[in-house]
Amino acid sequence: MKRSFLLPIAIGLTLSLPALAAPAKKAQAACPSQKFSTFFAAFSDSVPLQKAFTDYPLTTVMLDHAVEPEPRKISKQLPMSKLSFPLIPPKAVRTKQGLAFRVDQETDNNAKVSLFKVDTGYQVAYFFRKESCWKLERREDWSM
């Protein structure tokens, strides 16, 4: 009787071992588009896409306004854990806050988008690079 009881447990353990040996891989997000305008429209409105298609650590450039007599440029490499998402406000927020964006540069493999507010010192530039898909590689905040 003991033997018949132990056999199913042993078989169950044997069958479970391959699942334990290889950890499950995270599902890779599908590239929204190879065309930058379509990619950016999806990327700018989706935190999961922003997380999936950003290079880490993200190069972040900003102005230190506490320095006298002029602000100085600071460059940091920020891991995902130090970033606040969304990196680009979604369309509804941009509209509510009067923010606009323009594509300043676009080639087959690089693009630069500026997010700004007219008649204010708000200006943030986003730099993208395309490999198998577009990825955000740098953010520069020149806001005054």
Question: Whereabouts are the PLM-identified features?
Answer:
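Short, well-ordered alpha-helical segments enriched in acidic and aromatic residues
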Residues: 39-42, 49-67, 74
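Charged, low-complexity intrinsically disordered segments
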Residues: 40, 44-48, 137-143
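Short, low-complexity N-terminal intrinsically disordered segments enriched in polar/charged residues
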Residues: 22-45
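Surface-exposed, charged secondary-structure patches
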Residues: 63-119
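Bacterial N-terminal signal peptides that target proteins for export
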Residues: 1-9
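Short beta-strand edge/turn micro-motifs at domain boundaries
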Residues: 121-144
